[in-house]
């Protein structure tokens, strides 16, 4: 499911530095993580919703590729975003 505009704006401000920096990798990862969390709750409640499940897999894949890019370019920012969003224990 979609996340609210207020949540998205707060994530952009927190991870982007200002409200206009939406292209920063950390911002994109944070927004995808919020959308993944929302979709996960939806899929638990609606087990037969295959279209939403496919959307979830696409978002997870996109986040994985952005995390891989960040890991290869700046390991410090990569570790910080993992810790902030509690994504995985690397």
From Swiss-Prot:
What superkingdom heads the lineage? Bacteria
User: What do we know about how this protein assembles, alone or with others?
Assistant: Part of the 30S ribosomal subunit. Forms a bridge to the 50S subunit in the 70S ribosome, contacting the 23S rRNA.
> What name does UniProt use for this protein?
Small ribosomal subunit protein uS15
This protein's UniProt keywords: Ribonucleoprotein, Ribosomal protein, RNA-binding, rRNA-binding
Which family does the entry's similarity section mention? Belongs to the universal ribosomal protein uS15 family.
- MF GO annotations: rRNA binding; structural constituent of ribosome
The entry's cellular-component GO terms read: cytosolic small ribosomal subunit
> GO annotations under biological process?
translation
Query: Matching Pfam families, A to Z?
Result: Ribosomal_S15
- HAMAP family from the entry? Ribosomal_uS15_B
Explain the purpose of this protein. Answer: One of the primary rRNA binding proteins, it binds directly to 16S rRNA where it helps nucleate assembly of the platform of the 30S subunit by binding and bridging several RNA helices of the 16S rRNA.
Q: Which InterPro entries match?
A: Ribosomal_uS15 (IPR000589), Ribosomal_uS15_bac-type (IPR005290), uS15_NS1_RNA-bd_sf (IPR009068)
| PANTHER family per UniProt | RIBOSOMAL PROTEIN S15, BACTERIAL AND ORGANELLAR, SMALL RIBOSOMAL SUBUNIT PROTEIN US15M
């Amino acid at each position: 499911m979609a996340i609210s505009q207020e949540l998205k704006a707060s994530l952009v401000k927190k991870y982007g530095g200002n409200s206009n920096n939406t292209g920063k990798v950390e911002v994109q990862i944070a927004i995808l993580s919020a959308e993944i969390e929302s979709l996960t709750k939806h899929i638990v409640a609606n087990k037969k919703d295959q279209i939403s499940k496919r959307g979830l897999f696409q978002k997870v894949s996109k986040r994985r590729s952005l995390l891989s890019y960040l890991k290869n370019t700046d390991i410090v920012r990569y570790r910080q975003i993992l810790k902030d969003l509690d994504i995985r224990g690397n």
